[in-house]
A protein has these predicted regions:
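Short Lys/Arg-enriched alpha/beta "domain-start" segment
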Residues: 1-30
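Alpha-helical bundle regulatory/interaction domains
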Residues: 4, 89-214, 236, 241-247, ...
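N-terminal functional module of multi-domain proteins
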Residues: 24-122
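Terminal helix-turn-helix DNA-binding modules in bacterial transcription factors
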Residues: 220, 224-228, 232-240, 256-298, ...
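Short hydrophobic/aromatic patch on the recognition helix
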Residues: 249-250, 254, 299-300, 304
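…primarily DNA-binding HTH/wHTH and HhH modules…
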Residues: 301-322
Length: 322
């Protein structure tokens, strides 16, 4: 078993209401399965690790009440795909979204997130430790000039990484045993790291452009305007006037400062409000769609499912469950 699991995740799981469930082999004979105490929530958390090199995690659980997670993660590099999620990362603030590949660099700043009650967290991820990317890889490939930390940081969060999504699905669906399973997981971890490094090569950094204080203030005004008017169709030329920037500069500066496009920013605001309306009002799906800015409920349902992993009525059923 992985040292990071024994020393960090096991105490964290116990602290937050998980119970060791050694007889549960729904994800295969290898690894350890945990289940949430009925008083706290429901579902399972599966982990498999190899010494101090890496671990693999599969989540499928939900909490009965909104859950605040705050912890200092050990030094590591992780890559995860959420198939269902509802919540927000708080430092820095960003909405958690399903259907994307997300990386995280552990060991630098505390991780803080708010997870919404009753909405299932379904995810699969890989985590590698410094013993893997600073020692093991360099020992195997001493001539290679790679920086895994920069490569993982480059990805951050993207919906355009289909090969990684397929690999994580293969891990989630695998049910092997013994040495065959150990070799399978070891191979998939190496393949994932290879994909991350290749992704960095295919997406080289563009020359850095430092934002001026005036640019930052103008972007914050644009973001505030979008937050107040997210339900409307906002012409781009109005935003360029507000920002005192040309179209190209506005798009690039907004992406640089907020780490998302203007369209993605608006959609995140719409989905956050839609989640609230579905959970706490009796508005129909069509009424929710119109309230947050979509003319058809079918388009809204498609985007909502892409964002949370659930259809609107599925989300409401879970969120309003007592």
């Amino acid at each position: 078993m992985s040292e990071i699991i024994d020393q960090f995740y096991t105490p964290l799981l116990i602290e937050h209401g998980f119970i060791h469930d050694p007889d549960n082999q729904q994800y295969g004979a290898l690894g350890d399965c945990w289940k949430l105490s009925p008083e706290v929530g429901e579902g399972s958390y599966w982990t498999y690790g190899q010494k101090d090199l890496y671990d693999i995690k599969i989540h499928n659980f939900s909490f009965h009440e909104d859950f605040m997670l705050e912890c200092s993660l050990p030094e590591c590099l992780s890559i995860t795909r959420y198939d269902s999620i509802s919540g927000e990362e708080l430092s820095p603030y960003r909405r958690l979204s399903a259907g994307c590949i997300k990386t995280f660099i552990g060991g630098y700043a505390p991780y803080k997130a708010l997870i919404h009650k009753n909405i299932p967290i379904r995810s699969v991820g890989i985590e590698i430790t410094p013993a893997y990317y600073e020692e093991y890889l360099k020992k195997l490939y001493p001539e290679a000039q790679i920086n895994p930390v920069d490569a993982f940081r480059k990805i951050d969060q993207t919906s355009d990484f289909p090969e990684m999504s397929r690999l994580l699905t293969e891990i989630k669906d695998y049910r092997g045993e013994g040495i065959a399973a150990k070799l399978f997981y070891e191979g998939k971890v190496a393949e994932a790291v290879s994909m991350v490094v290749e992704y960095q090569k295919k997406h080289p950094d563009k020359p850095a452009h430092k934002l001026s204080q005036q640019d930052i203030e103008n972007l914050q005004i644009v973001a505030a305007y979008l937050s107040d008017h997210y339900a409307f169709d906002i012409p781009l030329d109005r935003l360029t006037q507000i920002a005192c920037m040309g179209t190209t500069k506005l798009k690039s500066c907004f992406k640089k400062y907020y780490d998302c496009t203007i369209t993605e920013y608006v959609q995140q605001r719409r989905m956050s409000q839609a989640e609230y309306l579905l959970a706490y009002t009796e508005l129909t799906v069509g009424q929710v769609a119109q309230t947050v800015g979509y003319s058809t409920s079918s388009r809204f349902a498609e985007l909502f499912r892409k964002s949370t992993g659930l259809l609107p009525l599925e989300y409401r059923k879970n969120a309003q469950r007592k």
